[in-house]
């Protein structure tokens, strides 16, 4: 029998796996003044660097190659120490890739919702 999490307890991925909240990605169709265009994803992103809560707005081109769940539902992103290990046993909808220097990220689906896992390479690693 699986035990249920109490209202005062953090989710399992935080409490037992050590995943750390990174950001919340929210799809939108409204252009924003501070957008950055990521051509290979057909995606405009904004808000991440200025939001005190880590909210990232994502506006997709119709031709975006990303998975439909990523384009239609908000996602939570967690920083993980070992991306490859974190992906074991997960349903991957966007395989590991490097959206920018020093960053590896992948998207999984959990209970029908997209979840992003991110790892960062440090100056010595």
Q: Each predicted region: which residue ranges?
A:
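Vicinal oxygen chelate
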Residues: 1-50, 54-68, 91-125
């Amino acid at each position: 029998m699986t035990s249920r999490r109490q209202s005062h307890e953090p989710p399992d991925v935080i409490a037992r796996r050590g995943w750390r909240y990174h950001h919340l990605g929210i799809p939108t169709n409204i252009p924003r003044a501070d957008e950055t265009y990521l051509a290979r994803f057909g995606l405009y992103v904004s808000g991440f660097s200025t939001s005190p809560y880590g909210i990232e707005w994502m506006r997709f081109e119709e031709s975006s190659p990303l998975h439909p769940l990523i384009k239609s539902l908000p996602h939570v992103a967690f920083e993980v120490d070992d991306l490859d290990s974190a992906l074991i046993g997960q349903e991957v909808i966007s395989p590991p890739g490097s959206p920018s220097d020093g960053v590896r990220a992948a998207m999984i689906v959990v209970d029908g919702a997209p979840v992003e896992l991110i790892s960062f390479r440090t100056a010595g690693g």
